[in-house]
Amino acid sequence: MSNYFNTLNLRQKLDQLGRCRFMERSEFADGCNFLKGKKIVIVGCGAQGLNQGLNMRDSGLDISYALRPEAITEKRASFQRATENGFKVGTYQELIPTADLVVNLTPDKQHSKVVADVMPLMKQGASFGYSHGFNIVEVGEQIREDITVVMVAPKCPGTEVREEYKRGFGVPTLIAVHPANDPKGEGMAIAKAWASATGGDRAGVLESSFVAEVKSDLMGEQTILCGMLQAGSIVCYDKLVADGKDPAYAGKLIQYGWETITEALKQGGITLMMDRLSNSAKIRAFELAEEIKEHLNFLYLKHMDDIISGEFSATMMADWANGDKDLFAWREATGKTAFENAPKADGIKISEQEYFDNGVVMVAMVKAGVEMAFDAMVASGIYEESAYYESLHELPLIANTIARKRLYEMNVVISDTAEYGNYLFSNVATPILAKEIVSQLKRGDLGEPTPAAEIDNVYLRDINDTIRNHPVELIGQELRGYMTDMKRISSQG
């Protein structure tokens, strides 16, 4: 097998990268009816597997789980999750032959083994689904010609997919059909029905491609979503403690600060996040963000280039073959950082506004990181809608994992693929941020409020205009408006 993207000519590459269409609500008028009465078998019962399955069952679909024999006999976590929620569970041999749609929701590194095991068992003309296209695009998996291959990729962790569905909404979702595997022309109907069953059509669906989803997803998770948060957490905590701050206070400011700060992104983008600062602090955050871009933009572009070329995937798959030696070593090193071992902040109170006032450089890191990731994706041919979802939109969700159990929780919740890319980025970004940004911070940049200063009205006006007119803000306003409309529709019943 060889990297599918690299087998395409330039025109085909640009076409696949640029596949992005925001679908109309009317296109989902039939809901998930196309899949009703069909047997759907999910392989894997982790966060995405369980929660998508719960949503699909609640939408009226026939869902069961195919697990490896040892997972069943040893009653492993996947078996317990499925059975405790009342699902039928069986081996591949028991369930796959009668399945109309097999959905592969195992980790990326297991996909080739899953395909090799289930493909001979699948009936003629069945369908095969993914929620991430890595196996097709980067590994170059070849699927039987009679099988339809589709993707439904919720832009949230599995737990969020379930919680949003339970409150009558959903999460933004990308869907795609693999052009090499749509023999009956039913791929889009299957993908739409699957997305509707998970609740994705209530929040907005992008018709994309396997290529666009993979390249943008890898870029977002490696840089702003995980890598920047990890690097920022480590250097900001170290700086606070070095400046004499109580380690417990420093740990809490960082651990919960990302979540509080990025919650503003969800409601009003970078504009609202920056508006939470005083004028003096906003100016300083803007200036710090520009400095961060000067020192880190090369790294964002390198990651984008390595993702497009396939260099990243080749490097990671070599580590898979080596027993994940690098991944495990980096994971262990992260667990030993001072931030991860900061004392608990029992009794320490930090108000919502204090997280903004005492975290100006954190706000700057978020602003710079979102804009650099978005710009790098768009410059590489990825459409703005996809770039928005893979940078700004998912950030509050990842920040929430840090609030729960710091970097450990983030790296547990995200995939091994995301975790590996996170370390590649943060291992380089951390010393750069420490030397070029954090060591140069002024009073009021971190740990205490920015001192009030005389404000140049013209300078402030220009900064505000620059913030509000960045392309990520313009497309974000449009997409968030759609989601607001959808929430209003769902709340009315």
Curated annotation (Swiss-Prot):
<dbReference type="GO" id="GO:0004455">
    <property type="term" value="F:ketol-acid reductoisomerase activity"/>
</dbReference>
<comment type="pathway">
    <text>Amino-acid biosynthesis; L-isoleucine biosynthesis; L-isoleucine from 2-oxobutanoate: step 2/4.</text>
</comment>
<dbReference type="InterPro" id="IPR008927">
    <property type="entry name" value="6-PGluconate_DH-like_C_sf"/>
</dbReference>
<dbReference type="Pfam" id="PF01450">
    <property type="entry name" value="KARI_C"/>
</dbReference>
<feature type="binding site">
    <location>
        <position position="76"/>
    </location>
    <ligand>
        <name>NADP(+)</name>
    </ligand>
</feature>
<keyword id="KW-0028">Amino-acid biosynthesis</keyword>
<feature type="binding site">
    <location>
        <begin position="108"/>
        <end position="110"/>
    </location>
    <ligand>
        <name>NADP(+)</name>
    </ligand>
</feature>
<feature type="domain" description="KARI C-terminal knotted 2">
    <location>
        <begin position="346"/>
        <end position="486"/>
    </location>
</feature>
<dbReference type="GO" id="GO:0009099">
    <property type="term" value="P:L-valine biosynthetic process"/>
</dbReference>
<feature type="binding site">
    <location>
        <position position="78"/>
    </location>
    <ligand>
        <name>NADP(+)</name>
    </ligand>
</feature>
<feature type="active site">
    <location>
        <position position="132"/>
    </location>
</feature>
<feature type="binding site">
    <location>
        <position position="158"/>
    </location>
    <ligand>
        <name>NADP(+)</name>
    </ligand>
</feature>
<feature type="binding site">
    <location>
        <position position="68"/>
    </location>
    <ligand>
        <name>NADP(+)</name>
    </ligand>
</feature>
<keyword id="KW-0677">Repeat</keyword>
<keyword id="KW-0560">Oxidoreductase</keyword>
<feature type="binding site">
    <location>
        <position position="390"/>
    </location>
    <ligand>
        <name>Mg(2+) 2</name>
    </ligand>
</feature>
<comment type="pathway">
    <text>Amino-acid biosynthesis; L-valine biosynthesis; L-valine from pyruvate: step 2/4.</text>
</comment>
<protein>
    <recommendedName>
        <fullName>Ketol-acid reductoisomerase (NADP(+))</fullName>
        <ecNumber>1.1.1.86</ecNumber>
    </recommendedName>
</protein>
<feature type="domain" description="KARI C-terminal knotted 1">
    <location>
        <begin position="209"/>
        <end position="345"/>
    </location>
</feature>
<feature type="binding site">
    <location>
        <position position="394"/>
    </location>
    <ligand>
        <name>Mg(2+) 2</name>
    </ligand>
</feature>
<dbReference type="InterPro" id="IPR036291">
    <property type="entry name" value="NAD(P)-bd_dom_sf"/>
</dbReference>
<dbReference type="InterPro" id="IPR000506">
    <property type="entry name" value="KARI_C"/>
</dbReference>
<feature type="binding site">
    <location>
        <position position="217"/>
    </location>
    <ligand>
        <name>Mg(2+) 1</name>
    </ligand>
</feature>
<feature type="domain" description="KARI N-terminal Rossmann">
    <location>
        <begin position="14"/>
        <end position="208"/>
    </location>
</feature>
<dbReference type="InterPro" id="IPR013116">
    <property type="entry name" value="KARI_N"/>
</dbReference>
<dbReference type="GO" id="GO:0009097">
    <property type="term" value="P:isoleucine biosynthetic process"/>
</dbReference>
<dbReference type="InterPro" id="IPR013023">
    <property type="entry name" value="KARI"/>
</dbReference>
<dbReference type="GO" id="GO:0005829">
    <property type="term" value="C:cytosol"/>
</dbReference>
<dbReference type="GO" id="GO:0000287">
    <property type="term" value="F:magnesium ion binding"/>
</dbReference>
<feature type="binding site">
    <location>
        <position position="415"/>
    </location>
    <ligand>
        <name>substrate</name>
    </ligand>
</feature>
<keyword id="KW-0521">NADP</keyword>
<dbReference type="Pfam" id="PF07991">
    <property type="entry name" value="KARI_N"/>
</dbReference>
<keyword id="KW-0460">Magnesium</keyword>
<dbReference type="InterPro" id="IPR013328">
    <property type="entry name" value="6PGD_dom2"/>
</dbReference>
<feature type="binding site">
    <location>
        <begin position="45"/>
        <end position="48"/>
    </location>
    <ligand>
        <name>NADP(+)</name>
    </ligand>
</feature>
<keyword id="KW-0100">Branched-chain amino acid biosynthesis</keyword>
<feature type="binding site">
    <location>
        <position position="221"/>
    </location>
    <ligand>
        <name>Mg(2+) 1</name>
    </ligand>
</feature>
<comment type="similarity">
    <text>Belongs to the ketol-acid reductoisomerase family.</text>
</comment>
<feature type="binding site">
    <location>
        <position position="217"/>
    </location>
    <ligand>
        <name>Mg(2+) 2</name>
    </ligand>
</feature>
<comment type="function">
    <text>Involved in the biosynthesis of branched-chain amino acids (BCAA). Catalyzes an alkyl-migration followed by a ketol-acid reduction of (S)-2-acetolactate (S2AL) to yield (R)-2,3-dihydroxy-isovalerate. In the isomerase reaction, S2AL is rearranged via a Mg-dependent methyl migration to produce 3-hydroxy-3-methyl-2-ketobutyrate (HMKB). In the reductase reaction, this 2-ketoacid undergoes a metal-dependent reduction by NADPH to yield (R)-2,3-dihydroxy-isovalerate.</text>
</comment>
<keyword id="KW-0479">Metal-binding</keyword>
